[in-house]
Amino acid sequence: GWGFDAAGFDAAVDVDPAAGLRLRLTLDAAGQFDITQAALPESRSEWRLARAGVPLLSTDPWLTVKSTNRAAYDSARTALPEGIDEVVFVNERGELCDGSITTLFFDRGQGMRTPPLSSGLLPGVLRAELGCPEEVLLAQDLPHVRLWVGNALRGLIGAVWVG
């Protein structure tokens, strides 16, 4: 692991937990950290989802760790079409993965599920908190499932697939 000055971090962070801010800690291999904070944007009660234009490779190890190596996600987020709140990535096998800033959840009528880590996605905090069973979701399944997206900052948000 990397060394980290926890006391220095505690001294550098002066945030009211009730403020509803996004706090981001970036740590490098030398143990140096950078802290940024920003207000969370207002969120709708239902997000409109579309497919990301670039497929992911499920074996890419960078998909399984929270890092700054996220060019595909950032590009897709920057290029969101009008009326779309989130894009969902598909891997080389046609399996749905993550959104650009969210985890995908779905229900076929048997309880909430989430795509398996083997599809190539981040084991996010919300995903761990909800403890949903994993199940492969293909694009052709989308008209037949109830959808949600979410993350640790925004919680679980109802979603509709618009393509």
Indicate where each model-derived feature is located.
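Helix-start/capping segments and mature chain N-termini
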Residues: 1-22, 26-163
